[in-house]
Amino acid sequence: MERVASIMYLYPGNQEEYKKRHDALWPEMKEALKAHGAANYSIFLDEKTDTLFAYVEVEDKAIYDKIAETEICQKWWKYMAPIMKSNPNNSPVALDLKEVFYLA
């Protein structure tokens, strides 16, 4: 398993809405994540800066990245775009992080 981490950014005033939407994550989106090798997916929030820290373990990063091509992922992005910084294609603005330490 490969560990993948990134940072994303909420627009101010959307912390509760972000949590609400993820608490009700669409079953089709859950299925797509699992089908693309995602496991142990967590998202943490820095409440002072509206910064999100996402962590997911993936079987194969290349396969996981293909989720972006799915209709359900693009629909999810469109749904989330009004409450977080997003690219022109509605994907979240995300900064991939480099792992610098791991303790098994």
Swiss-Prot record:
Substrate binds at Y18, Y41, W76, W77. It holds the Pfam family rhaM. It is an enzyme of class 5 (isomerase). One of its GO terms (biological process) is rhamnose catabolic process. Signal peptide: none annotated. GO terms for cellular component: cytoplasm. Its EC number is 5.1.3.32. PANTHER family: L-RHAMNOSE MUTAROTASE. Homodimer. This is L-rhamnose mutarotase. It comes from Listeria monocytogenes serotype 4b (strain F2365). The gene is rhaM.
